Amino acid sequence: MEIRRVTRLTKDDVSGRDFSFEIFAEVAKPYEALALGAEITTNPIAVTKKDFGFDESEFENIKEPDDVLFTVVEDERVYGYVHAAKSWNNMVEVRFIVLDVSIRGHGYGRKLLDKVVEWARELGVAGIRLESQSNNVAACYFYRQYGFKFGGYDEYLYKGIAQNKDETAFFWYYMLD
């Protein structure tokens, strides 16, 4: 498998991939403790499967140099991707990072983030920001292990989305200075 920089991604490119993940716990409060470097502790919740889907319009025309899209490719099939963009606050925002279930745990998430960090350094931005959810515990562990710092949370961000109303948005930062 190789990491490639591309300027578009289609449904055909990701056809047959399973980007879903299992929700089995949520990060325990108080969330403020995460900002102080506390260990991530969890509470069990009912097991469900979550899939963000794929909206081709999000990936039709990646506008370089302010957007970047890296893919994990084997035999011309995409098994994962990360989309990031330069934001108004001189930060890079990771908009999507997903991996097919068949390649999780093999270092490809780290390789994709390494490419984003390299790109962000080329841009000369202050750091990288991304959002996760309180019930995506595996992602929280991964971002913390990579070196992201917990920057805050928003308990109201998803209240207007019925299926996500109980989730809390977490914001993670990887500073480059």
PLM segments and residue spans:
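Structural preference for beta-strand elements that scaffold enzyme active sites
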Residues: 91, 127-129
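C-terminal "cap" of GNAT-fold acetyltransferases
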Residues: 126, 133-137, 146-149, 156-177
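Acetyl-CoA-dependent GNAT
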Residues: 7-9, 16-95, 100-102, 113-114, ...
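Residues within well-ordered beta-strands of beta-sheet-rich folds
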Residues: 73, 129-131
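Conserved acetyl-CoA-binding loop-helix of GNAT-fold acetyltransferases
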Residues: 99, 105-122, 141-145
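Short secondary-structure boundary/hinge segments and terminal tails
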Residues: 32, 94, 121, 138, ...
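Conserved phosphate-binding and hydrolysis motifs of nucleotide-dependent enzymes
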Residues: 76, 80, 107-109, 147
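Extreme N-terminal starter segment of soluble prokaryotic enzymes
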Residues: 1-3
